[in-house]
Amino acid sequence: MSGRDGSGVKMAYWAGAHLETTPVPGMNMKGLSVPGKMSVLPQAVWVDENCKRYCNEFWPTAEQRGYQNIFQTRKTKFAICDDNFTEYRQYTLPQHAGFDATESNVQALRDSLDEAYAKFQGTWEEPEQQEQGPMGGPMTAAEFIADDTLEGLADQLGFEGAAKEAFLAQIEEYNQYCEDGADQQFGRDAQVLFPVKQAPFYAVKFEPLLGEPLVTMGGILTDGEQNAVDKNYEPIPGLYVSGNDCGRRFGIEYV
């Protein structure tokens, strides 16, 4: 046995232990993935395929932010920011999957934005040898899309007609919240309401992903002394379960 084939869970189950029933909380159910994880871009504005915000982007932790995404359709989402993003990006809490605002990391982010703008202008020249610079925390090197105007950015994102109007209206509405110091949609704290006004403007596309399971989901239920319990939640004498074979490892997800 390899130790990673579920043997421990199966043996306990065959001995009468109770297997965690669905729905089973997952791990890292961020809902959005490559080229980056939207949950670690809380300073931006997130909109869905209908060009509408759908949550407070600035929840305390990356996991809580990412959790909002699993309730959305499995369609492309977008993070929108302006040219001041390198400043805004530094406003974050020390945490797992956070941004370490060192000088080199901030510069790496600036380089990513400048590269996107150069590609937009048609002046970008691919370097002879691509150096692997500092990532600056998760997904700093995400591929940005740049434009001089929000209208042009909407075009690049594929929004037309009513969708484009909805996109522009949503950003305008959000910017008003920034001016007023109160997010009337989702209650984002005034201290982290960063406007999208300074050109050039940038966006990142995010595609849906169900998650990244690293450990057992839906294992054997135990009591506080690691006794496996039966279907009536009574401890089974002499049968103990711990580690990756345990169920109920997470509440709603990896938080």
For the regions a language model picked out, list residue spans one by one:
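An anion/pyrophosphate-binding glycine-rich loop and adjacent beta-alpha core
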Residues: 9, 18-159
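Alpha-helix capping and helix-loop boundary segments enriched in small/acidic/polar residues
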Residues: 1-3, 34, 38-41, 233, ...
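A conserved FAD-binding loop/helix module that cradles the flavin
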Residues: 1-10, 246-255
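A glycine-rich dinucleotide-binding beta-alpha-beta segment and adjacent secondary-structure elements
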Residues: 149, 156-249, 253
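Residue-level detector of alpha-helical segments with a strong bias toward transmembrane helices
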Residues: 26, 61, 236, 253-254
